[in-house]
Amino acid sequence: EEQLLIKNSAEKFFLDNLSFEQRNKILTSEGKLYEDLIVKSKELGWYGLPFDQKFGGLGGNITDVMTLIETFGASLHVDPYIFSLLLPGKIIEHFFDEDKKSHYLDKIINDNIKLAYCFAEPNIRFDIHKLNCKVYLEENKYFLKGKKMLVLAADQANSIIVPAIDKDKYVYLVKIDNTSKNFLSNK
């Protein structure tokens, strides 16, 4: 019953707000139309759907989320929901401490922060135990050294979460600001 409500709500929303012509305008606009669509999506609670209620989410389950994503696909929705909200948000929800969870999930759900997860490395076949990207501390600053590839939705992200290992082989999740002068990208 909940999935039917989600599906009907999303279908009506897209029928009213994302015709084929509107979608093409969004894709060719400078972002204003897209941002308007995101604001409306947030008002419907879609950004809070996958997250626990104690962090301001709606506590939806995987079936709720997949119902919504299926409707996104059927409507040719342009938001990288999985890569800029669901994947990084769930990483934060499961691996960050309580204060950081509250802080970042609130920003994901209510503000306009978009994240990307930078997990792919050459030659490791997605095995987290074979990470080559290193994190190290020097003069009270953290540094990353290594290569990552294919960061989905990075072009729209404010920040990127990067898994890296230290000298003792502990895995760290490092959040870097996409606008930092120290952030280098080949985009």
Question: What is each model feature region?
Answer:
Residues 1-2, 6, 74, 87, ...:
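Glycine-rich beta->alpha junctions and the first turn(s) of the following alpha-helix
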Residues 27-28, 56-59, 123-126:
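Short, small-residue-enriched loops and turns at beta-alpha junctions
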Residues 3, 14, 45, 52, ...:
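Buried hydrophobic positions in well-ordered alpha/beta secondary-structure cores of metabolic enzymes
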Residues 43-111, 153-156:
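Internal helix-loop-helix
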Residues 106-187:
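FAD-binding core of flavoproteins
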Residues 13-20, 107, 115-116:
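Short alpha-helical functional segments enriched in proximate histidine and acidic residues
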